[in-house]
Amino acid sequence: MCDLAVASEAATFALPGATVGVFCSTPAVGVARNIGRKRVMELLLTGQPIDARTAQAWGLINRVVPAEALDAELRRFTDLIVARSAATIALGKRTFYRQIGDSLEAAYDIASEAMACNMSYEDAAAGIDAFLGKRPMDWPSG
């Protein structure tokens, strides 16, 4: 499963296995967790593609951009992410995926533990200090 997805306006998305006698069972696992049962069943049972705008409306992708702007949008997205604390992003991703399938109570327990851990990071102290001082971030972890 990918964390983020950006597509050009020309992109289409499909689970076409049924059209050739092979049900897309394994792709359906990740797709269903993003777009829900009825929408994934539409893709699985019909094999018909959806356009990029529909994929975005359904929650399958984050952004739709003109084809000529795709590389620039991807670069902008990645530049924003790599400007963040790598240690914090790593902890956040691990925590997010660890809690996402749990009950609300269990998810809050996992997230609270991660927040407490995160606050002990050098990057957290440096980031808060830089924010309060209105200075650019300079992550100790690199």
Predicted regions and their residues:
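Well-ordered beta-strand positions
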Residues: 4, 42, 46-48, 54, ...
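Mobile beta-alpha loop/short-helix "lid" or hinge segments that flank ligand
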Residues: 20-23, 48-53, 87, 93-94
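Terminal peptide-recognition signature
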Residues: 55, 92, 131
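C-terminal long alpha-helix characteristic of the crotonase
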Residues: 6-11, 61-109, 116-117, 122, ...
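CoA-thioester-processing core
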Residues: 1-44, 58, 73, 77
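Hydrophobic alpha-helical segments typical of transmembrane helices
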Residues: 27-30, 39, 91, 111-115, ...
